[in-house]
Regions:
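N-terminal, membrane-interfacial amphipathic/helix-forming hydrophobic leader that caps
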Residues: 1-112, 121, 125, 129, ...
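Helix-boundary and loop/linker segments of multi-pass membrane transporters
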Residues: 28-33, 64-65, 102-106, 144-153, ...
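Alpha-helical transmembrane segments of integral membrane proteins
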Residues: 34-46, 70-74, 108-116, 153-157, ...
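A generic helix-loop boundary/linker signal
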Residues: 47, 91, 100-101, 117, ...
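Non-cytosolic membrane-interface motifs at loop->transmembrane helix junctions
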Residues: 66-74, 142-146, 217
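Hydrophobic/basic alpha-helical segments enriched in Actinobacteria
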Residues: 89, 93-98, 104-105, 113, ...
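Transmembrane helix-loop-helix hairpins at the membrane interface
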Residues: 121-122, 138, 146, 150-254
Length: 254
């Protein structure tokens, strides 16, 4: 038994997060969530669809979706599906995201998330050195557009990349998708791999696929070991922070 996850009695909820197991152990009356893969698919496909619709709508109004306020709108619009649907689904079909996704977590889990974030940075850096020998220089789509921003748009974009994206993506991937796969009785290690694969593919950055897959694997392992999506959020924030700060500092200097 994983010592980081309390014993439960939540046998009807495979892959149940720490918060769910703790609540059961404390005698709280919870219901077995009925959300699942259908909701995970709605979240991911909905996010892609929203991204396309919003970008096309902005362009039809002569607003650049990769610059200024248009960028902020295009960047955040998919979050309505990516995080919004999982939150709605768990609220209606479960016990809310705090319990069903393990957003409630002890400090020990968050500290582990911080350490894992540092590990993901080290792994990504090492892999990047190897990958660039075959692909040439690497860059992220978010980084490229971020460097062209100024003023309040720049600051908001950096904050969204540093905090917003990790929170939203972890709710979608290590929260909803991970939970749905685990509820389908898949092996927990396979769940980590699948969520990492989908996470990497979702970014639509072929050159960075291996890097994103490695990061996703570490984030998934954090979720598996702790049972806390919040721990994965902390790790993701740590991973995104250096690049976000680089965008801010570099853009301010130009």
């Amino acid at each position: 038994m994983n010592p980081l996850i309390p014993s439960d009695g939540a046998s009807g909820f495979p892959g149940a997060p720490w918060a769910f197991k703790r609540a059961i152990a404390q005698g709280e009356e919870l219901k077995i969530p009925t959300w699942g893969m259908g909701d995970a698919i709605i979240s991911l496909v909905g996010a892609i669809g929203l991204s396309l619709i919003v970008s096309l709508t902005l362009m039809s109004q002569n607003i650049d979706p990769e610059n200024g306020w248009g960028l902020l709108i295009a960047f955040s619009a998919p979050w309505l599906a990516l995080a919004g649907w999982p939150i709605l689904a768990t609220t209606i079909k479960g016990n809310g995201p705090g319990i069903d996704f393990g957003l409630l977590a002890p400090r020990t889990h968050l500290r582990l998330g911080f350490v894992a974030g540092l590990a993901s940075l080290a792994a990504a850096s090492l892999i990047a050195v190897i990958v660039t020998r075959f692909t040439g220089p690497l860059s992220s789509s978010a980084g490229d557009v971020g460097l062209n921003q100024t003023g309040i748009v720049l600051v908001l974009f950096v904050l969204m990349a540093m905090f917003g994206a990790p929170i939203v993506e972890e709710i979608a991937f290590r929260g909803m998708l991970y939970g749905a796969l685990a509820k389908a009785h898949l092996n927990e290690h396979l769940v980590v791999v699948i969520t990492a694969l989908v996470f990497a593919l979702f970014h639509f950055e072929p050159k960075r696929f291996v890097i994103l897959f490695a990061i996703g694997t570490i984030l998934g392992e954090v979720r598996r070991r702790t049972g806390s999506t919040s721990a994965a959020i902390v790790a993701h924030i740590v991973n995104n922070t250096p690049a976000a700060l680089y965008i801010l500092v570099t853009a301010l200097r130009t």
